[in-house]
Amino acid sequence: MKMIVGLGNPGQKYAGSKHNMGFMVVDGLAKRLNLTIDKLEFDAATATTRLNGEKIFLVKPQTFMNASGRAVRELMMFYQIQLDEIFVVQDDMDLTLGKLRLRKRGSAGGHNGIKDIISATGSDEFCRLKIGIQHPKRQRVVDWVLTPFSKTDQPLIDDAIEKADDALEDWLNGMPFDQLMNKFN
């Protein structure tokens, strides 16, 4: 079993915002797999399929970002999903715009959605795919992450989403994580 969790905030108000990068990536992967993420369970919108004989979950928590851990924990418990079967997709202000970084484990690095997942699961031992949204120069962080990308930045973001979905597909198809890091970092 494998579960890919895209972090974001629910609702039209936040659609396309920088903080919803995880949602955008998971939506792109769902499109590739001909899935619709529309089943509501455990405070999350989910879709399931089978790939190479393995059950796959795509998840978009429907709590706000800072409470994402509850949905992740409840899905893990109900479906008996292990931490090493989880891949979380997140935005990262410390990375340049559109840059990908894959990590096997680690601290939240200031990301409240990741912090809540670590708190809810009791561990930081889960895979992450971070996509750079870069740090705001003069704008307040909360305003920065909740605004959409500029039209000039959008092509770079679209390319980053494609690469992120390539990485997730490779993982779903069994590529070892160390190879993923070498290929996409």
Curated annotation (Swiss-Prot):
Enzyme class name: hydrolase
UniProt GO molecular function: peptidyl-tRNA hydrolase activity; tRNA binding
Physiological role: Hydrolyzes ribosome-free peptidyl-tRNAs (with 1 or more amino acids incorporated), which drop off the ribosome during protein synthesis, or as a result of ribosome stalling.
Sites annotated Stabilizes the basic form of H active site to accept a proton: D91
One Gene Ontology biological process: protein quality control for misfolded or incompletely synthesized proteins
Parts of the chain that traverse the membrane: none
Location of this chain's protein in the cell: Cytoplasm
Family: Belongs to the PTH family.
Pfam families membership: Pept_tRNA_hydro
Residues the UniProt record annotates as site (Discriminates between blocked and unblocked aminoacyl-tRNA): N9
Primary location group: cytoplasm
Protein source organism: Lacticaseibacillus paracasei (strain ATCC 334 / BCRC 17002 / CCUG 31169 / CIP 107868 / KCTC 3260 / NRRL B-441)
Key words, A-Z: Cytoplasm, Hydrolase, RNA-binding, tRNA-binding
Protein name (Swiss-Prot/TrEMBL): Peptidyl-tRNA hydrolase
Enzyme Commission no: 3.1.1.29
Entry's Gene Ontology cellular component terms: cytoplasm
Superkingdom per UniProt: Bacteria
Catalytic activity line of the entry: an N-acyl-L-alpha-aminoacyl-tRNA + H2O = an N-acyl-L-amino acid + a tRNA + H(+)
Residue numbers annotated as active site: H19 (proton acceptor)
Binding site for tRNA: Y14, F64, N66, N112
InterPro entries: Pept_tRNA_hydro (IPR001328), Pept_tRNA_hydro_CS (IPR018171), Pept_tRNA_hydro_sf (IPR036416)
Assembly notes: Monomer.
